[in-house]
Amino acid sequence: MKAIYGLNEVKFDGQVIGWIDEQGLQPAGTAPTQVDVYAAQVKDGPIATITSNPGKKAFTCNLIDLSTENLVKTIGGTKDANGNWEPPEKWEKTAPMDISCDSGETIRFFNAKVTGNDFANGINSQGVLALGLNIELLKDDKGKSLKIFAKGIDPETGAPAVNPEG
């Protein structure tokens, strides 16, 4: 099968983060913007098209594992001696992110800026409280923003993954 599907696991800054709701990661980027260039001498259309904004790649998701440890791993803040979470002033953190898919591929975001948008889903008997996350794919120092690793390839090494069971 050639389709990429199913959210298996999300690693952010080298650590597995907790559950994402059943909607998984949803595209939230913007399309590139082009400007047409017209010449007075050419009457039937533009002579060129210039990309004025390259757009951006982004995803959104709802984090439903709101354990103190998970919140610290995902958007920062601190955990005190009693296990309470104190949020940071800015609800954001930037680090590599790996999306492991049920189909076997791993999608690496080399420089993912994760921002806590706001709480989602409410506190009620119909669902669980979540933290809405926005994930922007920024370029790293080598100019890379993402790469899709084939089934069985370790994103850390780029080589076939070693099976620990032999």
Protein language model regions, located:
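Solvent-exposed edge beta-strands and adjacent loop segments
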Residues: 1-71, 113-130
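Charged, amphipathic alpha-helical segments
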Residues: 64-87
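Mixed-charge, glycine-accented linear interaction segment located at domain edges/termini
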Residues: 106-166
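Acidic surface patches and DE-rich sequence motifs
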Residues: 11-12, 21, 42, 80, ...
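Beta-strand secondary-structure signal
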Residues: 58-62, 96-98, 132-136
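Short, cationic low-complexity segments
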Residues: 80-97, 152-166
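Acidic-leaning, charged glycine-interspersed low-complexity segments
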Residues: 86-120
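Short, surface-exposed beta-strand/loop "edge" segments at domain boundaries and coil↔beta transitions
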Residues: 17-18, 68-70, 101-109, 143-145
